[in-house]
């Protein structure tokens, strides 16, 4: 498995709405993530700084990257763009983090 971590932001007035939209996520989005090899996907909120910290384990970079081109992912991004900063293609503005320590 490949471990990934990344950060995003959520609008200061949208913490509750962001959480509501994820509980639960759309079943078809969950199915796409799982079918593309995503496991143990978690998102944490730093309420003071409006930061989201996400971790996920993936089976391959290619399969993970392919999620972005699915119809359900495109619809999800559009659904979320009003509660968080987004790129021109509606994907969440994010930065991948480099792993510097791991204890198994």
Curated annotation (Swiss-Prot):
Pathway: Carbohydrate metabolism; L-rhamnose metabolism. One of its GO terms (molecular function) is L-rhamnose mutarotase activity. GO terms for cellular component: cytoplasm. The keyword Signal does not apply. Keywords: Carbohydrate metabolism, Cytoplasm, Isomerase, Rhamnose metabolism. It is an enzyme of class 5 (isomerase). The active site is at residue 22. The keyword Transmembrane does not apply. GO terms for biological process: rhamnose catabolic process. InterPro entries: Dimeric_a/b-barrel, L-rhamnose_mutarotase, Rham/fucose_mutarotase. This is L-rhamnose mutarotase.
């Amino acid at each position: 498995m490949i471990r990934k971590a990344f950060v995003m932001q959520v609008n200061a007035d949208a913490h509750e709405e962001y959480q509501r939209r994820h509980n639960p996520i759309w079943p078809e989005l969950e199915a796409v993530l799982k079918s593309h090899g995503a496991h143990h996907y978690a998102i944490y909120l730093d309420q003071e700084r409006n930061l989201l910290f996400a971790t996920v384990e993936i089976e391959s970079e290619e399969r993970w990257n392919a999620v972005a081109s699915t119809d359900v992912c495109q619809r999800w991004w559009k659904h979320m763009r009003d509660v968080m900063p987004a790129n021109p293609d509606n994907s969440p503005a994010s930065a991948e983090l480099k792993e510097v320590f791991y204890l198994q």
